[in-house]
Amino acid sequence: MPSKNASSTASLDTSSKEPTVDPATCTHQYEEKVTRKPRVLDVGEKTFTCKFCNTSYIEEIAKTNTIKILAVGNSLTSNATQYLWEIITSAGVPKENVTIGRLFLPGCSIAWHWSNIEDFKEDYDYSKNTNGSWLTQQNFSVQAALEDEEWDYIIIQETIASVTNPTAYSHLGDLILYLMTAEPEAELAWQLIWTYQAETTSQWCKFKTPAETEEHFGKIVSTYKSQVQHWSQIDHLIPAGTAVQNLRSSYIGDTITSDGIHVNDKHGMYITALTWYAALAGGDLEAVTWLPSRYPDLADDLPVIRQSVKDAMKEPFVITQQAK
């Protein structure tokens, strides 16, 4: 991880705890705790609290210099990261300071990832973006991808086929422990995925009505709460699925996938990458200026896309109605 140097600027505060020593006469001995981790576009904070009188003060932690993200997933993580490099760099992060990596195995679940790790399987396509283009290598293992960079963030998710099945998460603890051991300085994140598109002729179409898709998304959320949320080692939630559901409630409608499940390369890949940016980079959504060159008209929809992401970050477990 990049160096996280605290600034010298401090602001005084008084703890709500009952002091055991008069702060005016106390010979302070402060204990330090990071209360907000810095990100590439957002400063962090350290809180120093006196163990005798509970007086505290806050110091700012400088932004990190680089951001390196590794997604261990399947086609939905590939969808969500397709535009991520462009979005982060357009917000002002130097291009040479952004690295996006992803391990791709179609339909790969948490249990399957864990089995591949145990058996040192080299079954993945490993794609990496350091300059705006994806370079893909085949026959890669999870171990090799972890060793390729000193990753700042590692993202995991469950596959759509088993995302609502509680038994599918039986090896989540094993996977978390392995990743933390392999990359102890990295922060873990979980992508909350989206559900199927309704009323399509696609082979992926599981539901006939929007009400059925909303019900399924509710099950995705409830399963996350029961099977994932209690893992304190997961530092971040990326509510990409919530952002997609929010956008589906807008005038754009349920037209965001290319085949009933994989998001399309217009609204779909854009809103999911923007959600990753919001969750991991910490920058303002309005600072993102990049648009896919083949979709200049996407600029007209940026207000509702941004609002869908903002609402997802604020209320990740609730579908927020957008402008019709």
PLM feature spans:
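Viral virion structural and adsorption modules
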Residues: 2-21, 324
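Extracellular modular ligand-binding repeats in secreted and cell-surface proteins
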Residues: 13, 17-63
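A short acidic, often aromatic-flanked loop/helix-cap motif at beta-alpha or helix-coil junctions
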Residues: 39, 107-111, 243-248
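N-terminal module-boundary/linker segments of secreted carbohydrate-active enzymes
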Residues: 62-92, 291, 314-323
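Conserved catalytic region of serine esterases and O-acyltransferases that act on ester linkages
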Residues: 65, 256, 260-263, 267-324
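Short hydrophobic segments within beta-strands
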Residues: 70-72, 103, 191
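Conserved SGNH/GDSL esterase-like catalytic core that processes O-acyl groups on lipids
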Residues: 78-171
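Alpha-helical cap/lid subdomain in secreted, periplasmic
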Residues: 138-266, 278, 287
